[in-house]
Amino acid sequence: MKKITRRSFLAAAGVSAAALALTACGGSKSGSTSTAASTSTAASSAAAGDAAAAANDPKVTLVYAEVNPLDTIVGQTGSHFKEKVEELSGGSVVIDVQASGVLGSENDVLDAILGGSTTIDISRISAFALTSYGCNKSKLLSIPFTFENRAHFWNFANSDLAPEFLSEPQELGLPVRGLFYGEEGFRHFFTVKPVATIADLKGMKLRVSNDPVMNGMVEGLGANPTVVAFGELYSALQTGVVDGAEQPIANYKSNAFPEVANNLILDGHTLGAVQAVITDNAWGKLTANQQAAVMAAAADTQKFNAELSETAENKVLDELRSSGCNVVDVDDKTPWQEACAKVISENTSDQAELYQKLLDMKA
């Protein structure tokens, strides 16, 4: 099938609702997308008990796309999901994790799977990535300074509100469904030249991924948003195409960015919320027992990610400091929040009530 862009997909698909049911952990149908937050311990145990039955089902291999290396938080999360799916399915479902962006950028992967490609079955994406395809609720997860801390985010991810976000793609007729939420830590700016305060960012060329919220945030900080593909970021920093960028701490180190931009300012403008989605085509290949195993593995993986993320990030931060990286703490984030006030208002006013629910979930 011809590859489509986000623009052409939206033009063709419109906003038609699709009430696609998920098979629940016991093999029954549910009218909304099941989530790790709503999957009970009892249901997970039942799915584990079904492993013997699933083991006799036809073997299925699902390709899982991950843009970051396996040693990152999200990479380890993908590896854990693979292990749990294969364990709980009795080996009848095999997850082939393709990491380090070998299958393309996040947008490339989404364009492919939403365009009908059957090469990729599951993708770990930024929680707001589907915003470009009409999922407006997802946009709220990328608004600067929405989540005060990790506990705030996990209050959301484990709440009754999370399924409303995860089910949005299906409600819009997109051929994917959410599996689980996760996070890779707060995102911070890193630069070639030292940065001590927000004022030092003025006039800098900062890499963005052409996301409207990110563009507005960078402009609010007085910098110039510059679109660069993630795979080209290292060389862009090295050659002066951009002066800096932003990433979660673990990704910053794992992608060797300290080699070319050894200054990290801990502004924590957004939490790197992520989710995994599976295509309807892949979901349809699975038997009821296999679907149950996948959802139980998703629930377990969400819990695993929550436990891993903070510990892993603290370890990496200590390593960065020890290696000579110029790490700058930000004690007062008020100037940063004020600089982002415009982009926050512009991107939440149409969903003010829903956004307030997110804010009210702070720990």
Where do the language-model regions lie?
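Gram-negative bacterial Sec-dependent N-terminal signal peptides
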Residues: A11-A21
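Extracellular mucin-like PTS domains
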Residues: T33-A47
